[in-house]
């Protein structure tokens, strides 16, 4: 009833590794059940007749030094319903494994490669996971992991996806020094719990996440000259704020404007000029 991709890349802040999961399903709030990840440890997706305890147990095993194959073996040997379970795991080094129990509803299966595990059940056919793997392989390895995961999810959906239909989707990416203010390991944690087109909505939310919760790149920073400062001052005052800092805080653009007022993000400047 679900298709997912679990992966590792090195596009985190400063080039640090990051891990993530993207998942979609004809199931309410799939993001509440399937994905789990911790920076510096790994990521996993537990699905089919999902054993949700595998999230905590699996990450604990990885944290203790188990490789993905060892962690998988431990999880399976302690679960009497292993034949009904499906799971994908990627460990700290990018070793990937995927398990599909023999009792999972057709079509069910998975594909693995370096840094990636893809799996699904109740799918239209193997073309779903194959399309996801092809999209992953074709993606730019330097691109943000969230974008690569989403592209794979879109490919799986377009190839047929869950044969029962669509309902929810989720995206989770972790990396040290990520998140709001760079003081967490959660770079992306987005969920569409109940929608006709959940993957499309997830894409819209990721655009917003990038704007509000991702730091500007050097290419996106516009130096605030005296001339631009005067323009900005007029714009923020017209919007009812005493200065740029007040406008920035009110509109939640803290990660897109320098604390010392030396630069402003090109997108945020466009928004300010448009009076939005």
Regions found by a protein language model. Give the residues of each.
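A short amphipathic alpha-helical interaction element
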Residues: 218-257
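Structured segments of extracytoplasmic/periplasmic soluble domains
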Residues: 61, 78, 135, 152, ...
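Extracellular LysM carbohydrate-binding repeats and other cell-envelope/extracellular binding modules
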Residues: 252-276
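N-terminal nucleophile
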Residues: 1-226
